[in-house]
Amino acid sequence: MESEVSSDIFIKRQQFDYKESHSLVFTLDAKLDDGEALTKVYTDFIDYKCSSSDEDMPAPSEDIQKDYEPQNSFFGKDTANRFPKPKVANENIHHVHVFDGSRSWSIWEAKEQFYRVCDTLLFYSSFLKSNTRYFHVLDFLYNPVGDNKSHQKMKDDIYMQALADRAELYRKSL
């Protein structure tokens, strides 16, 4: 089952129901500009997570990522953010690296998931509630220049706190 609705908290919602595992719900934060680039990344993100196993939710373990390629070639390292504590960790904020052309496709594609890194990042929160796994896309930082500005944002406590606040607002709205 797939559905799309809007609210003051999110601008898109898609739900996929599976008989033998969790239902998956994907949303885009209402503060995001729903342009063409984000729509493509959001669609690919849904495909990536829908093709992952339940054990790999919300993200594959570091060991799995070091040994295998991702389910969707456009995505690289997928990892939890831990700072500032405790809110970012409590809201289960993650980021995944997204292919941006700053490296050649042949080099990107030849690497296992953990080693596919760049400075274009998709931030999301994830949680499980009533046998449904929720993924809320919080931000997309497109930076093909590769000057590390997106990664520097993760060191900005105010920015990360704002992501955690939006994740908490979404989680509490359900």
Which residues does each PLM region occupy?
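Conserved beta-strand/loop element in small beta-rich adapter and peptidoglycan-binding domains
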Residues: S126
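Basic, Lys/Arg-enriched alpha-helical interface segments
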Residues: M1-C118, K129-L174
